[in-house]
Design a protein with these regions (language model features):
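Short loop/edge segments at beta-strand edges and connector loops
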Residues: 27-29, 100
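Acidic/glycine-enriched edge-of-secondary-structure segments
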Residues: 40-44, 66-73
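Catalytic cores of nucleic-acid endonucleases
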Residues: 67, 73-122
């Protein structure tokens, strides 16, 4: 029997994989999370700047303040549907990865854009505690035009991560 993995399981694997190399890791980060900067040249006295241009399944900030995005795909149809969306995975994202289970890798690996990396969830029944492990199959090519985020954006990402944590904890009751 083939073991399958869920999106929440993938989220935890990604968290564990990038935990030591990240300042913060936030699931389901929306493009609506903008930062306001004081700007007296604007009519309202501020300007608003989006952190990302689309929703990210996982957004992490590296220890050098660069953004890293991971798109989770647990089926081939889910993977192919991503290419029908109107957005791309560029902007100020330094590294972009697809995270997929081992059982769809052969069907999608040739469809992955050149700059995107691939993380693969592998199942090993012989492991005592965690049967699923995430391994890097292909390294992401760094986006050379990406710049480190500033303190305001980093604080906003921390805040969104904090709010999401408590939102989900309250729902567990």
């Amino acid at each position: 029997m083939k073991e399958t993995i869920t999106t929440p399981q993938m989220e935890l694997l990604i968290y564990k994989y990038f935990e030591k190399s990240s300042l913060v890791i936030v699931p389901k980060f929306s493009r609506l999370n903008a930062v306001r900067y004081d700007d007296n040249t604007k009519r309202l006295g501020y300007r608003s700047e989006n952190i990302v241009t689309h929703e990210c399944d996982i957004l992490s900030v590296t220890k050098n303040n660069f953004l890293r995005e991971v798109e989770i795909k647990v089926s081939v149809s889910d993977f192919k549907a991503d290419f029908k969306k109107k957005h791309n995975h560029e902007g100020n994202i330094k590294q972009f990865y697809y995270a997929v289970p081992y059982y769809i890798l052969d069907k999608i690996k040739d469809l992955v854009p050149e700059q995107a990396g691939i993380l693969v969830a592998e199942y090993n029944a012989e492991l005592l505690s965690e049967h699923w492990q995430l391994k890097r199959y292909k390294k992401a090519i760094d986006n050379k035009s990406a710049t480190p985020i500033d303190e305001e954006k980093l604080n906003k990402i921390f805040r969104i991560g904090y709010l999401k944590y408590w939102f989900y904890r309250k729902r567990e009751k």
